[in-house]
């Protein structure tokens, strides 16, 4: 299957050539899905399968790039720029329907809900509602099957899952506020950026000298609760840690320290899968208390310890077999990541201990060929936390910042995993 990544594959200005290229790539994509027994895309399916296969992912990324090129070519440069740079209103409209609870007012199923019913339930202006719903349905959020008659589709049904609703609501509210202050935050640093998590677009947007996490969990608790629930919603897009690294290969009784492990969900999952391992979940005390309040399954309770710990301080657990960092380092700048890793390195036992970094490795494609999802997530990390998503080269740079003895031994992923699949970087200390 051809998955060419050179500029010529997507930069044509010939409309017919572009259409033929899209058609052939779709054929290759569907053929690959059929070959691996995966579901074909269907917007009416609210729970689509996450495809990890490299060939399918490469074809999918190419289709997305080609379709973007097609839309730009048909619209023309000026209209394309206007459409792209007014897209913030799409997010604003989705945020509005979530705030009004329209996703709950429109009943699941084939029977439509009228605009008048939505007006009655919300008390909102019919004129404004109609204009908001027009934008949403055009962006495939709900279907308007007759004038002012709306039903759910596979996209809008996602909002009925509270974690997904919280994730999208956070993006449409907090995310838009951060985006509005993005350039101002960079101007403050003369466009050089900052390592300080309190000197961000987020801090400008909320007029605070606190970082995102501190603000959400100490000042605006309602936003903090939504954010925490939304982060749980983001889990549906992530590859399971235990599906990438063979924890069963660790020695019987091995100790895994889940650094910044939140409520302990990942440790519980791995403990249930691999009976011979012991876990220490480290995080803020309030986070750990929330995890314990939710309850730990009886079958693994004796093998999971909860330990309050700030990973910017000395690591108290010495010589563990594994120090796991799952989606921690992308929240931080290189200098802060180096501090986190250095504290772990000081606790490691050469020849025994390893660090497992469960985090994204951004593909090193040319800009036009790269993943838009990773690009936007990277800038979200910058705007909110002064963090970043990293390429393999950037990961290696960070590792060398920590210690010349710290080496990347292996990158783990699911079998045949592609550029958008999860990855685990295994780090060891040279003796």
From Swiss-Prot:
Q: What Enzyme Commission number(s) appear in the record?
A: 2.1.1.-
Query: Which residue positions are annotated as catalytic?
Result: 330
Q: Does the keyword Cytoplasm apply?
A: no
Major enzyme class: transferase
Q: Which UniProt keywords apply?
A: Methyltransferase, S-adenosyl-L-methionine, Transferase
PROSITE patterns under this entry? SAM_OMT_II (PS51683)
Q: Name one GO molecular function term.
A: O-methyltransferase activity
Which residue spans traverse the membrane?
none
Q: Which PANTHER family match?
A: O-METHYLTRANSFERASE ASQN-RELATED, PUTATIVE (AFU_ORTHOLOGUE AFUA_4G14580)-RELATED
- What is known about what this protein does? O-methyltransferase; part of the gene cluster that mediates the biosynthesis of the isocyanide xanthocillin and its derivatives. The first step of the pathway consists in the conversion of tyrosine into a vinyl-isonitrile intermediate by the isocyanide synthase xanB. Subsequent oxidative dimerization of this intermediate to form xanthocillin may involve the cytochrome P450 monooxygenase xanG, whose expression is coregulated with that of XanB.
Family assignment from sequence similarity: Belongs to the class I-like SAM-binding methyltransferase superfamily. Cation-independent O-methyltransferase family.
Name of this chain's protein: O-methyltransferase xanE
Species whose genome carries this gene: Aspergillus fumigatus (strain ATCC MYA-4609 / CBS 101355 / FGSC A1100 / Af293)
